[in-house]
Amino acid sequence: MNFQNYQCIEFHREGRVLHIKLNRPQQKNAVNEALHLELSRVFVDAQRDAESDVIVLTGNGAAFCAGGDIDWMQSSIDTPEEFERTAREAKDIVFSQLDLEKPLICKLNGHATGLGASLALLCDIIVASDQAKIGDPHVSVGLVAGDGGAFIWPQLVGYAKAKKYLFTGELMSAIEAERIGLITEVVTPEVLEARVTELAERIASGATRAIRWSKITTNLPLKALFHAHFDTGIAYECMSNRTADHAEAVKAFREKRKPVFTGH
């Protein structure tokens, strides 16, 4: 598979392991229009890649993914019709990630927030640096976590804990995330690369079909959940994109102040 047409994502191979790296390090790998479009097709291309059996997803630089790019958020406020296209791409991202038959390991090298957290949590195995934090602060910018977070968090940690984090937008340490079952494993930054390589190579050397079919089977309930409810979640997020509270949150972020929400 040729991945040369990607601009915001880098690729490299180690044997039968394909590494996918979000590559906007100066913006903490925040998702802009270009990266969002590439994410909507990268897992389809990874599935089609005949030279790999395991995929590793990570971020370039100090962060894994800081969620939505603030300039892109402003663009969606200014032209809300564009958010409808974004919503369709969001659906492609989630379902292509769930449809990927190859084991997908997240190397959580740094903070993962919002969409970044959803990208991580929809992976099969999540190995994190103990310096990383994870959370879904959609509500902090006046948005609904309808593009994945509202569905995957309760499946991993239960509704009581999920609602606390989704309603407050609070970030948690990787150590706490491992403790409550949100992620798989936490290691020091010095051994993160080696640990992920060890896991990826072990899985890649296993019974490929049995492993893939085990993943497919395990993902069936998740896929059923997303197929049943994702359209509603993303519709609510589209509605929240048009609210005064969202516009205020983005304006406040740009002005480096705390937003004043009015419930509108």
Where are these regions (language model features)?
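Conserved CoA-thioester-binding segment of acyl-CoA-metabolizing enzymes
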Residues: M1-N60, F95
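Terminal peptide-recognition signature
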Residues: I20, R24, L39, L57, ...
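Hydrophobic alpha-helical membrane-association signature
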Residues: L35-E38, T86-E89, L192, G233
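Short, charged, surface-exposed hinge/linker loops at domain edges
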Residues: K215-A224
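Short beta-strand->loop
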Residues: L225-F230, G263
